[in-house]
Amino acid sequence: MSSNRISETERKRSRPVTKRSVFKKNKWLSPFLVLIIVLIAIVSTILVLNPFEETEKTTTSNSPTTGNPIAVIDTSLGTIRVEIYKDKVPNTANNFINLAKARFYDGLVFHRVIKGFMIQGGGFEADGTQKQSPYGPIDLEINPNVHHVDGAIGMARGSDPNSATSQFFIDDGNQPQLEPGGVDVNGYAAFGVVVEGIDVVRAIASVDTTTKYGMGDWPVNDITIESITIEND
């Protein structure tokens, strides 16, 4: 009796294949196969169109390529790390580094922020009191290979090109008009670039502003420079 047993699978194979059964199978398989082909095509297209997606995400921030010092700017909205181009703009870089090491910037605020332009600080306390650099003004130092790219740090100054002291700004986006021959024939000294924390720059640049102490574009809620420390110097 055991020889007469046929498993369920074998029974299915033993059934006669009719035109109707073939049609039913094909009718079910055709849309299924089409769906598989479409999915394969979609996946292939995604792989072709986005082969460098991860690379693009990781290269949106600048990376230090030399042994230059790194300024760690701790603010009330987060930390910004800036490579200071001591190798390319030494006098301006050393002025900033010396002020940071002397704890000059600790507790000051970003007193002027304009979205899509820049964030500026290093000269005023939260109550509007101006703080003067103990080192006095420095000469304008322009390196033609250092540009006002997104995240560049530069020195603020008055109409006199050699009047920069302690106030600095960080570009929120590319600012070619700050190069020599732009809004000012002499240009503004750029001396480094953000390597981490450009999102913090964006956040600061996006806050609501008002007029305080006779100055416009002052953040409604103070953004404090808690400290600036220098690494690798």
What function would you assign to each model-found segment?
Residues 2-233:
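Cyclophilin-like peptidyl-prolyl cis-trans isomerases
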